[in-house]
Amino acid sequence: MIIKNIKMENFRSHRNTSINFSKGITSIIGQNGSGKSSIFQAMNFALFAPRGNNFRIENLMQQGAASFSVELEFEMMGNTYLVKRKRFQHKTDDKLYVNGKLNAESASEINKKIEEILEIDNSVFSNAIYIKQGEIANLIQMTPRDRKEVIGKLLGIEKYEKASEKMNIVKKSYEETLLKLEGELTQEPEILENLEKLKNEVSESEILKEEILKKYENLEKLKLEKNSEILQMEEKFAENNQLKENLKDIISEIKNINLEIQNFKNSLNLVAEESKNISENEENYKKYLELELKIKELNNKLIGHKSNYESYNKLKTIEESLLKELGVLKESLKDNKKNPDELKENLKENDEKILILDKIKEKIKELEFIEKQIYEIKIHKKTVETLFDSVKIYDDSIKTFEELKTKKNSYENLLKEKFDLEKKLQNETDEKTKLISELTDFEKIEEKINLENELKEKYEDLSEKIDKLNEIVLKKESKISEYKNSKAELEKTKDSCHVCQSKITEEKKQELLEKYNSEIQNEQLSTESLKKQLEIILNKKEKMKVKLNEIDSFKLKYGELKEKKNYSLKVEESIIETTEKLNELTGKINEYSSLNDEISLIENKLKNLENDYKNCNYSSQFLTKNDESEFLTKKLELSKIIGDYDSSKIENEKKSLENLKDELKNTIYNLEREINLKKELKNIQNDISSKIGIVECYVKWETEKSDFENKLSECKENYEKYMESLAVLKNYSKTYSVEINNLNEFLNQKIAEKQQFCEKLLETRTEIEKNIQTVNYNPELHENAKRLYENILNEFNDILRTLERISSELKLKNENISYLNEKIQNLSNKKEEKKKIEEFKEYLDKIKREIFSKDGFQKYLREKYIPLIQRHTNQIFQEFELPYSHIQLKDDYSLIVDGLPVETLSGGEQIAVSLALRLGISKAVCNNIECIILDEPTAYLDEDRRKNLLNIFKNIKTINQMAIITHHQELEQIADNIVKVRKIGENSKVSLE
């Protein structure tokens, strides 16, 4: 796979980033946190869209964005692929293009296709193509055992260990099932015993059931006989009751028919009587109707002319009123000689005189107010002079009171501060108590933490010893191997030395063979001894590692407790400081002990002087507002205007003028009223003359109407009797649906019909009474038969219940037998199941032992991969142009370079070996690898090692494309392409150089 381009929108810190890649080395350079590693994370997401915390949408999407997208273009086997992944909060939009054509759209389909194209999954991609920070240096520095574990993870062997662990869980669940089955199978003897017991009980119940069935059949026969007798009696009882009911109905109907006959007779009498009344009152009835018509005609005429008549009467009333009022006015005006205009001029002159008097009256009031003000000024002057000393004392007391108030505020602030300090002290004391209880384990943990450096030194010493012993053991094993080879060669030789080809005797050959055997034995003994020492040291190291791990596990808690310890010291210091402040405040507060008494004293003094101060202040304000000289000048001016007038004189003159004014107004009104009334009287008299003819006719019609009404009253009684009788006859006519003239005939006919029907009913009654005697029903015999039947029925029901109970018990027992038979069958099935599980458990043990155990398939994979890793490692190592030819990865995962332990090489050479090994592992995992991504490969390396690594990178030819993520600027020197990443605000910006 060769990466061509990556595009990111709203992905982590990349708002809108596009990077083109080419073959060779691409250095992605930027400071920590600039967004370099996000570029690889985007590639990983584009290819496989993995799940997990690191790939959660909220963690990948920029804050405030509604979506993010990643596009990756790459080449593989001559084809161009473009993967597009877009994510919203609740929606996905993925596409895969092959050579520009849409190939897949769903996320799962794209993931599957990518795995098919690359021939690797996400796990292999993450381990083979992406080399994480520190992996290169760590491969050399770690022990063979740790190296074995790391390489196992990179190769994916650890999944077989996990599978082995999961198989233990499965195996355990089967073991639990076996225990459960064994427990259930213990019930079998008890179930068989219960089954036999139930079968015996069923046989006994069947015999009892047969006996009861015989009794049941005899009683049922007797019950049917007695039931037949009762049914016959019930029929007689029903027939007798029906006849009695019929007789009762006939008697009732005869009674009703007689009532109807009587009602028809009564109606016939009433019709005759009402017909007579109609004949007697018919003449006056007709006369009444004629009078009523005439009255109605006159009434219509009166209504038509009523308005004219009422208008005439109203005009006559007004005429009388006007004549009367004109007479009164003429009497009142007999002494007046002036016309209205002259009188109005006199009224105007009178009003002007009244106005002058009102103005003088206002001036008198103004003068009285000024004299009052002058008097009050004198009073207030005297008040100010009298209270001057009291006011001065009051002002001094106010100043003193303000000073005391300021002191009181200070005092209250001190009290508040004291309260706050006491509260703070209480809280700190509680906090201290809490911290003391939480810090009980602190000293023990601290003591263990303090031993860490010492343990680490010992651990490192042991590691060095182990490495040295391993080196010695390797050398000795190499020597043993050489001796064995020499011995084997010597054994093959007949008469010449295998080394120098010189002649050798059999004795010399035996001597040399013994020497080789002796050397081999000595070296083997020495090696065994060293291995025992090594095992002891490894055990010590492992125990020490356990202790160090324990210390590591304590570190987090220790950190928390350390913080709490420091915090507790601060709390203690704060308690001391707060206590000192509290003591100091208490001293200051005591200085204010007499303050309240002083304030009370001054408050009483101010209270006593307050009225004097207010009075004096009011008088001073009054004198400021009112100038005495101005009031005196005004008094003089007003006195000149008023002259010898006083209020009494003005009132008398004004009263005379008002009386004259009223007289003039009254005379003017009467003169004008007389003229208007005369005009109105003339108009009314003309209207009266026009209406006099109509009024005479109206009076005549009223007289005629009154005469007719009197005559109508005389005929009214006969009219009402006629109408009442007619209403009765109409009611009968409506009731019987017959004309009034045919009522007599109809009622006589009805009476005859009803009498005839009544005679027939009497005959039926006689017949029913005879039938009742014929039935001959006896209630006593019927009751005795019912009691006997009831006793038989009760006995029958008792037997039936017993029979049902036995049947129910039999059914239940048979069901229990079926249930127990099923249970026995189930237990038989469980025996089979137990056998199968035991066989399958043995099969699982075999699979685990032969495939998933460390000595099974895992061992096979390691043995398969070690030569493959070694071959790829050496191919890459050859490109580095170093003075070494061969790297050996031994079975125990120790590294040998040209026969020397890797630890004996220089730092730069070790890095070269480590890089070759890491790339070799990648190629072993993914044979067709063309691209490698290295994340901070120079991390944790000193300057010399970094320089060596740069030179090595230049020499790599096996891998077509390398992307190096780094913050070291030196990597620009070896790069074919440079991508610089920097953080501006919250966004990453990329530039190509």
From Swiss-Prot:
UniProt organism field: Methanococcus maripaludis (strain DSM 14266 / JCM 13030 / NBRC 101832 / S2 / LL)
Binding sites annotated in the UniProt record for Zn(2+): C497, C500
Binding, ATP: R12, N32, G33, S34, G35, K36, S37, S38, Q133
Quaternary assembly: Homodimer. Forms a heterotetramer composed of two Mre11 subunits and two Rad50 subunits.
Coiled-coil features, chain-numbered ranges: 192-222, 402-493, 570-612, 646-677, 702-731
Keywords for this protein: ATP-binding, Coiled coil, DNA damage, DNA repair, Hydrolase, Metal-binding, Nucleotide-binding, Zinc
Similarity annotation: Belongs to the SMC family. RAD50 subfamily.
PROSITE patterns hit by this protein: ZN_HOOK
SUPFAM superfamilies, alphabetized: P-loop containing nucleoside triphosphate hydrolases (SSF52540), Rad50 coiled-coil Zn hook (SSF75712)
Cofactor(s) in the UniProt record: Zn(2+)
InterPro entries associated with the record: P-loop_NTPase, Rad50/SbcC_AAA, Rad50_ATPase_archaeal, Zn_hook_RAD50
Lineage, uppermost ranks: Archaea, Methanobacteriati, Methanobacteriota, Methanomada group, Methanococci
Role description: Part of the Rad50/Mre11 complex, which is involved in the early steps of DNA double-strand break (DSB) repair. The complex may facilitate opening of the processed DNA ends to aid in the recruitment of HerA and NurA. Rad50 controls the balance between DNA end bridging and DNA resection via ATP-dependent structural rearrangements of the Rad50/Mre11 complex.
Name the record gives this protein: DNA double-strand break repair Rad50 ATPase
Stretches assigned to the Zinc-hook domain: 452-556
Pfam (any one): AAA_23
Domain text: The two conserved Cys that bind zinc constitute the zinc-hook, which separates the large intramolecular coiled coil regions. The 2 Cys residues coordinate one molecule of zinc with the help of the 2 Cys residues of the zinc-hook of another Rad50 molecule, thereby forming a V-shaped homodimer.
Molecular function (Gene Ontology), one example: zinc ion binding
GO biological process terms held by the UniProt record: double-strand break repair
Free-text cofactor note: Binds 1 zinc ion per homodimer.
